[in-house]
Amino acid sequence: MKKATIALVALAFAAFTAQAQTTSANIVGYSKTSHAIGYTISAMQFDGGENGPTAVYGDQLPAGSKIYAWDGSGYSIATYGNVFVPGQGLVTKWNSEPSLAAGSSYWVETASAVDSIVSGSVNTAATVTNSIAAGYSLVSYPYPVERTIADLELSPTAGDKVYIWDGSGYSIITYGNVFVPGQGLVTQWNNPTAVVGVGQGFWYETSTPQTWVVNKPF
């Protein structure tokens, strides 16, 4: 359960080279999430190279914590706790390394309240294109920026839904006919100002496969 995701991204130039008219930079960012006891839907919005739970979270989460990575039909589950390592005995570590690659979203379960920090390189591509399958997808906005539903640049069809987890239940936003005074019925999201925070993932439900093209917002 997420008490708050702090919409904080540090944009620090880790490398900067200028020769004639050529400039290159690596932008490094981080997001901080405060987990209460229970479940959070988190998002990986940075490229950190290695992308398993050990690389992403290390020992930040308490023993007994779990990560559930959705593959479209089920979960790969990683647990942080005592694992027997030959020659070392019991070692506290993650027992598996499902991919938490940039652009992915996943559940985090914690047995006690804790803050976690996720960091890595910020995607600076002008656009990012992702495919959304029919059914339910656990997705992430590809840039570490807070967005309203209207700003996500989704390409919805009537009946599509966004599910935002608030720690105890879902806020459900539906795309369809909405009465707008002075305009009548308009096809749009019924809560376009709902917010998806930095480091926060969400469920997307659609009956039609879609291509999601996002333009860099900064």
Tell where the protein language model's regions lie, with residue ranges.
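Sec-dependent, cleavable N-terminal signal peptides
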Residues: 1-21
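N-terminal exported-region signature
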Residues: 15-218
